[in-house]
Amino acid sequence: MSTLNQAHCEACSAGAPQVSEAELPELLRQIPDWNIEVRDSVMQLEKVFLFKNFKFALAFTNAVGEIAEAEGHHPGLLTEWGKVTVTWWSHSIKGLHRNDFIMAARTDEVAAKAEGRK
C-alpha cells in the first residue's frame, strides 16, 4: 500500500516545481494502473474505472469530487454509463506535481470502497 494516500496536498502555484524525471518512476510504482497521457504538451495521470451502471459511476464521481474539494485539488472527470475517467494534473504548473500522485492514490482508495465496480 502506498503512503501517498495518507499525505496531504500542498499549495501549488505557478512557480512550483514539476515532478522530476528521477522522481517519476518511484511515484508511478506507488499508483499502479495509472497511465501518463500528454495533452497539449502537458503530462497528466489518467485511469479508467469501470462500474456496473451509471448510478454507481456517478456515485464514484461524487466521492472523488468530495476528496478533491477537501484537498483543494481538482481532477478532470468524465462520467459515462459504467465508466469514469479520472485525470489528474496541476493546471498552474502545466504538468505533474506530487499532489497529483497523492490524489491518484486517494482516488484508488475511494475506488476500493466503491459499490458496483466491475
Curated annotation (Swiss-Prot):
Q: Which domain of life is it from?
A: Bacteria
Q: Does the keyword S-adenosyl-L-methionine apply?
A: no
Question: Single GO molecular-function term?
Answer: 4-alpha-hydroxytetrahydrobiopterin dehydratase activity
Q: Name one Pfam family in it.
A: Pterin_4a
What is catalysed by this protein?
(4aS,6R)-4a-hydroxy-L-erythro-5,6,7,8-tetrahydrobiopterin = (6R)-L-erythro-6,7-dihydrobiopterin + H2O
Q: What is its EC number?
A: 4.2.1.96
What keywords appear on the UniProt entry?
Lyase, Tetrahydrobiopterin biosynthesis
Mind telling me which SUPFAM superfamilies this protein's record contains? PCD-like
> What family is reported?
Belongs to the pterin-4-alpha-carbinolamine dehydratase family.
Q: Explain the purpose of this protein.
A: Involved in tetrahydrobiopterin biosynthesis. Seems to both prevent the formation of 7-pterins and accelerate the formation of quinonoid-BH2. May also have a positive regulatory role in the expression of phhA.
Name of this protein: Pterin-4-alpha-carbinolamine dehydratase
Supply the source organism for this entry: Pseudomonas syringae pv. tomato (strain ATCC BAA-871 / DC3000)
